[in-house]
Design a protein with these regions (language model features):
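Carbohydrate-binding surfaces of carbohydrate-active enzymes
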Residues: 11-195
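Single conserved hydrophobic/aromatic residue that forms the stacking wall/gate
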Residues: 1-10
Length: 195
């Protein structure tokens, strides 16, 4: 609240902005466990799935993520950290295109995950599966050139099921009958727009 106008409350729901209302660069700094640097007693490491989802969240909000890795006095990185970094690296090997060079998509966050964007490419990050076809909210029908799974490049068809006729303004991607996502941490759909 303001000192002069106690009834006034200032909120930052629209992100961090400068005096002109333009978004500012920002960064989230996180640790792999609960301490900065090395702490032999701290064995409470964050799972790689949590770190991947936080990375995607930062990018989808227009930010950067710094990940702290604390080597010991001899320069050795703890085995727990190496395992987590290896798992993050395996996910990035398949999905880095949805992170590097991307930023906010200007689309409301879907219930199942996040959305990042790079030019005419939208990346729908699915942290959990939907019941049936995936609603690609924020995209106008007729503006999609192609949808594919980023992890393997396989094309994903647009659903034309009769159950979607009540939602003419939403495009639905059909991942098929298997309710299990290809990647339990974050399955990424790359949506190429015509413009």
């Amino acid at each position: 609240t303001s000192r002069r106008q106690r009834q006034m409350c200032i909120r930052d729901r629209h992100g961090i902005r400068d005096v002109n209302g333009d978004p500012l660069n920002w960064e989230a700094c996180i640790t792999m466990n609960n301490n900065w640097g090395y702490c032999a007693r701290d064995k409470f490491f964050k799972p790689s799935s949590m770190i991947i989802k936080k990375l995607v969240e930062c990018v989808s909000k227009g930010g950067n993520m710094l990940l702290n890795v604390g080597p010991d006095a001899y320069g050795n990185i703890p085995p727990e950290s190496l395992q987590i970094l290896s798992e993050i690296g395996a996910w990035m090997k398949k999905n880095s295109k949805s992170v590097y060079g991307c930023g906010m998509a200007g689309i409301e966050k879907p219930d199942y995950g996040r959305v990042t964007r790079n030019g005419n490419l939208l990346y729908y990050h699915m942290f959990e599966n939907t019941m049936g076809p995936v609603p690609l909210t924020g995209i106008k029908p007729g503006t999609i050139k192609k949808i594919r799974l980023l992890c393997d490049g396989s094309e994903v068809p647009i659903s034309d099921s009769w159950v979607h006729t009540d939602y003419p303004d939403i495009v639905f991607a059909n991942l098929g009958p298997d309710p299990v996502l290809p990647d339990a941490v974050d399955t990424v759909l790359e949506v190429e727009l015509t413009e």
